C-alpha cells in the first residue's frame, strides 16, 4: 500500500467514537447528579462527545460528497447537518422539558449564525487575503430566492395571524410547503440547472489539505455505516444529557433562546470550519454552497419533521419571532441579496454581515 493511501486510511480510523462512548458511560453513572461542578463536568464531556461525532459525520459525508461531485457534494453535507439538527431537537423535545420555542429559536440562530457570522467572517478573511473574491452570482441567487419566502412564512408570517401562531392545520400546511419548496430547489440544483452552483474558475490548487475532500481507501458503504454510527452517537448523548443540560442552563439563568443558539452552534461547527477554510483557499463558491445550502435544507426539512413529531407527541410549537428578531433576520437576508448582487465580494461585505451578527447576539443575550 502506498504512503498516500496509508495516510488517507489513517485519517479515517474511528478513534473519535471514544468520546461519545465515554460520555454515555458517565451520563449513565452520574447523569442524575445535581451538584454544580459535576453537572458542568458532565456537560463539557457531553459537548466533546457530540462535537467529536458531529465532526466525524461531516468528515464521512465529505468523502461521499467528493465522490459524487458538485452540486451533489454540497447537498450531502447540507443534509448531514439537517439530520444532526433534527436529531438534537427531537432528543431535547422527547424529554418533555424543551420549550415550545426550541425549533423556532434554532432556525433563527442557524439563519443568523450563517448569514451574519459565518458569511461575515468568510468574506472578511477572504477579502483580506485575496482583496476581491468571485462566485457564480446566479447560483447564490437561487439559494436566496428559495430561502427568503421560507424564512418569512415560517418565522414572520405567524405573528400576523389572530393567535400569533399557526393552528395545527396551518402548521402542517407550512410543513408541506417547506418540503415542496426544497423538492423544487433540488430539481433545479441536481437536474436542470447544475451549472449555476459551480464556479468554473474556483482555485483548487490552493487547497493544501491532503485529506480534505480526497478519495478514501475505504468503500462508500464503509463511510455510510460510520456516518450512521456517529449520528446515533450524537442522538444518544444528546438525549441522555438533556436533563443535565437543563439543570446547567437553569443554574446559569441562561435566556430561553440560548438553547436554540447552542444547538445551532453545535451542528454548524464542523461544516462552518470547513467552509471557512475553503474561503481561505479561494474556493468561495463551495463555501457559499455549504452555508446557504445548510440554511435552506435546515428550514425546508426541519420544519416538516419536527412539526410531525410535535403533532404525534402532542407537543406545542411556537413559530413567530419577536419584533427585534424579525428586524435583524430580515435585514440579514436583505443584506445577502445586496452583498451577492454583483458576484464579487470584499472586506466591506464581511464587515456589514458581522455588524448584523452583533445585533443578533444582542437579541439572544440582551
Curated annotation (Swiss-Prot):
Gene Ontology biological process: response to alkaline pH
Intervals, Periplasmic compartment: 96-106, 165-167, 238-255, 312-318
Activity control summary: Pronounced pH dependence with sodium as substrate. Ca(2+)/H(+) and Na(+)/H(+) antiporter activities are both inhibited by magnesium. Ca(2+)/H(+) activity is inhibited by the proton ionophore carbonyl cyanide m-chlorophenylhydrazone (CCCP).
Superkingdom in the source lineage: Bacteria
Gene Ontology CC annotation, any one: plasma membrane
Location (main, coarse): membrane
Spans through the membrane: 17-37, 38-58, 75-95, 107-127, 144-164, 168-188, 217-237, 256-276, 291-311, 319-339, 346-366
Gene name for this UniProt entry: chaA
Purpose of the protein: Sodium exporter that functions mainly at alkaline pH. Can also function as a potassium/proton and calcium/proton antiporter at alkaline pH. Does not play a major role in calcium export. The K(+)/H(+) antiporter activity may enable E.coli to adapt to K(+) salinity stress and to maintain K(+) homeostasis.
GO MF annotations in UniProt: potassium:proton antiporter activity; sodium:proton antiporter activity
Protein's organism: Escherichia coli (strain K12)
Keyword Transcription regulation attached: no
Keywords carried by this UniProt record: Antiport, Calcium, Cell inner membrane, Cell membrane, Ion transport, Membrane, Potassium, Sodium, Transmembrane, Transmembrane helix, Transport
Places the protein is found: Cell inner membrane
Cytoplasmic-facing ranges: 1-16, 59-74, 128-143, 189-216, 277-290, 340-345
InterPro entries noted in UniProt: Alkaline_pH_Ca-Antiporter, NaCa_Exmemb
Protein name as annotated: Sodium-potassium/proton antiporter ChaA
Membrane topology recorded in Swiss-Prot or TrEMBL: Multi-pass membrane protein
Catalysed reactions listed for this entry: Na(+)(in) + H(+)(out) = Na(+)(out) + H(+)(in); K(+)(in) + H(+)(out) = K(+)(out) + H(+)(in); Ca(2+)(in) + H(+)(out) = Ca(2+)(out) + H(+)(in)
Family classification: Belongs to the Ca(2+):cation antiporter (CaCA) (TC 2.A.19) family.
Amino acid at each position: 500500500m502506498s504512503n498516500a493511501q496509508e495516510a488517507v486510511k489513517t485519517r479515517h480510523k474511528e478513534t473519535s467514537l471514544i468520546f461519545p462512548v465515554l460520555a454515555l458511560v458517565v451520563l449513565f453513572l452520574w447523569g442524575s447528579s445535581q451538584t454544580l461542578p459535576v453537572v458542568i463536568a458532565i456537560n463539557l464531556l457531553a459537548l466533546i462527545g457530540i462535537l467529536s461525532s458531529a465532526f466525524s459525520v461531516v468528515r464521512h459525508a465529505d468523502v461521499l460528497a467528493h465522490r459524487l461531485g458538485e452540486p451533489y457534494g454540497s447537498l450531502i453535507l447540507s443534509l448531514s447537518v439537517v439530520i444532526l439538527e433534527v436529531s438534537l431537537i427531537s432528543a431535547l423535545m422527547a424529554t418533555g422539558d424543551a420549550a415550545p420555542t426550541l425549533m423556532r429559536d434554532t432556525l433563527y440562530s442557524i439563519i443568523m449564525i450563517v448569514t451574519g457570522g459565518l458569511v461575515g467572517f468568510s468574506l472578511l478573511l477572504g477579502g483580506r487575503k485575496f482583496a476581491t473574491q468571485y462566485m457564480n452570482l446566479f447560483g447564490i441567487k437561487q439559494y436566496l430566492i428559495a430561502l427568503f419566502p421560507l424564512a418569512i412564512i415560517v418565522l414572520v408570517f405567524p405573528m400576523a395571524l389572530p393567535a400569533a401562531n399557526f393552528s395545527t392545520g396551518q402548521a402542517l400546511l407550512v410543513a408541506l410547503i417547506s418540503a415542496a419548496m426544497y423538492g423544487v430547489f433540488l430539481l433545479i440544483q441536481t437536474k436542470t440547472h447544475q451549472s449555476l452552483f459551480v464556479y468554473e474558475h474556483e482555485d483548487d490548487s490552493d487547497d493544501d489539505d491532503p485529506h480534505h475532500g480526497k478519495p478514501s481507501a475505504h468503500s462508500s458503504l464503509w463511510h455510510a455505516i460510520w456516518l450512521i454510527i456517529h449520528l446515533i452517537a450524537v442522538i444518544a448523548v444528546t438525549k441522555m444529557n438533556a436533563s443535565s443540560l437543563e439543570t446547567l442552563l437553569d443554574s446559569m439563568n441562561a435566556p430561553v433562546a440560548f438553547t436554540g443558539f447552542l444547538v445551532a452552534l453545535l451542528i454548524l461547527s464542523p461544516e462552518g470550519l470547513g467552509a471557512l477554510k475553503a474561503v481561505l483557499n479561494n474556493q468561495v463558491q463551495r463555501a457559499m454552497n455549504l452555508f446557504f445550502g445548510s440554511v435552506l435544507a435546515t428550514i425546508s426539512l426541519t420544519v416538516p419533521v419536527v412539526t410531525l413529531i410535535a403533532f404525534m407527541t402532542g407537543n406545542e410549537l411556537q413559530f413567530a419571532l419577536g419584533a427585534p428578531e424579525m428586524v435583524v433576520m430580515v435585514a440579514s437576508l436583505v443584506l445577502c441579496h445586496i452583498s451577492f448582487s454583483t458576484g464579487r465580494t470584499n472586506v466591506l461585505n464581511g464587515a456589514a454581515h458581522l455588524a448584523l451578527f452583533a445585533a443578533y447576539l444582542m437579541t439572544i443575550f440582551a
